Amino acid sequence: MERLATRLLDAARVPRGIVDGPGAARPGRRDVSSASLRFCRYAPETGDDAGEAPWSTCRPHADAAWLALAPIGDVPGLAFYDAARGAWVEPERGREGSLLVWTGLMLEAHDPAYKAAVHMVRRADRERVSAPLLLRGAPDSPDMRAVWKALQADDAAGARASLLADRELVS
């Protein structure tokens, strides 16, 4: 997975200095990373859920990460918004055992040509378990702190300006 992530970030021309590495999450700690491997459990749909919104506990959102990767399991439910079609698409159906990769808000802030993937998890008739890996930036670099603050304020333009402020890191 590391080689795949490195190739994807290199293809997007993301500077290595602002990507998380050993010891990036906490100064002096080489055993901690700000990348996040999440284990998510989604309860199955019940009759009581019929009138509720189509998502489970995961409403439509984009991830605060450079990239996200997740193995595709046997219970589909992940849906991505396709702005060109104005519709939700479900790329997991029929692709069990594959790996799904999508773009995050940090990549969009770095280069607006890459749009963060808006996604949600739809309800299923069975329990769904997922394990997404979120590849995040090195939070101790000054530019990344500003990027995080801008992303939390839903300000993509401010996040991009923060990335571009440090000319040594962004080419």
What residues fall within each predicted segment?
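Conserved double-stranded beta-helix
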Residues: 2-77
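Catalytic core of Fe(II)/2-oxoglutarate
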Residues: 55, 72-171
